[in-house]
Amino acid sequence: MKVVSYLKGIPGSNKNPEKPEVLKRFVQGVQVHGDVGIAHDGLYTPSDVAVLQGYVHEDSPHTPHLQLRKQVLDEQAKRNRRTIIVDSNLFLYLDKQNTKRYLRYSMDGVFPTTGNYFSDNPDPKRWLKVSQDLGIRTREWRTQGNHILICLQRNGGWSMKGLDN
């Protein structure tokens, strides 16, 4: 199996060492298991699995790193090959340096209808660990009394799938 991670899919202005590190370590893991792993610093090259740090949306700017991400996703899909997308920790606002190294991994997309988050068999204790690590407190769902549930996301977030906010 040939796995290629795309270092040029990271913005040139990036100052976060975690972004290239995760791509390089992914490749190291592939190599340890006897497969071909390449941390690639160029344009698209066919592979069994491509690895991207971050995703590209329909309305994303036409910058070189985002154009490469789009090309990788499109070419891999056209060849019926896989793409792993490594994306940011949803709770970065609580741990700006991501000291616990929480990241999101999906295959072939980031939307519920296009991506696979490998969540068919979730560990029921996982949320307890994440919430304890990051100091997140939630309340049980309440059916008595007057309560309002407000669900928010940033403009252009993935779950809107093109709908206006």
Residue ranges and their predicted role:
Residues 59-136:
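Active-site-proximal region of nucleotide-activated glycan assembly enzymes
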Residues 142-165:
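Conserved catalytic-core segment of nucleotide-activated headgroup transferases in glycan assembly
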Residues 1, 128-148:
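Nucleotide-sugar donor-binding and catalytic loop/hinge architecture
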Residues 45-46, 79, 143-144:
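Residue-level preference for short coil/turn positions at secondary-structure junctions
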Residues 17-24, 66, 70, 165:
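Short amphipathic alpha-helical segment that frequently serves as the phosphate-/nucleotide-binding helix
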Residues 25-28, 129, 162:
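Charged/polar, solvent-exposed surface patches and flexible loops
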Residues 5-6, 37-40, 50-52, 74, ...:
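A structural signal for short, well-ordered beta-strand segments and their strand-loop junctions
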Residues 1-59, 156-157:
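N-terminal pre-catalytic "stem/leader" segment of glycosyltransferase-like enzymes
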